[in-house]
Regions:
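N-terminal helix-loop segment corresponding to the beta1-alpha1 unit
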Residues: 1-123
Length: 124
């Protein structure tokens, strides 16, 4: 997609609310947005139900790629770090402290990639 943000790569880390909305807007303006989704776990749909999941997701998650990862798996965390190394920005929407517990907090990511823009959206 073309737009003023064409050529920028953004990694979206989970959550609901403002994070996916922000990622949608960046994608609409041409950024290459990669959403990190949880690997299928026991058929959970994040408590949204089929109706809400299909309607909201089809709107909010449009225009971006998705990678399924298990952020508690060392191999998948390494894959995520490799994605971040090639990114321009991060959008993080987890509860406070989650990224740090996963070993992916701002200190770790910014030490690896000092020019990274780290966007944090807290709703909790």
């Amino acid at each position: 997609m073309s737009g003023p943000l064409q050529g920028l790569k953004v990694i979206e880390f989970g959550g609901i609310g403002p994070g996916p909305f922000c990622a949608m807007m960046l994608s609409d303006m041409g950024a290459d947005v990669i959403r990190l989704d949880r690997k299928a776990d026991k058929g959970k749909d994040r408590g949204e139900g089929a109706f809400l999941a299909s309607g909201r997701r089809s709107v909010l998650h449009r225009g971006r790629r998705s990678v399924a990862v298990d952020l508690k798996s060392p191999a998948d965390v390494q894959r995520v770090l490799e994605l971040v190394d090639g990114a321009d920005a991060i959008i993080e929407g987890f509860r406070p402290g989650v990224m740090e517990r996963l070993g992916l907090g701002p200190d770790v990511l910014l030490a690896r990639h000092p020019r990274l823009v780290y966007g944090l959206s807290l709703i909790h």
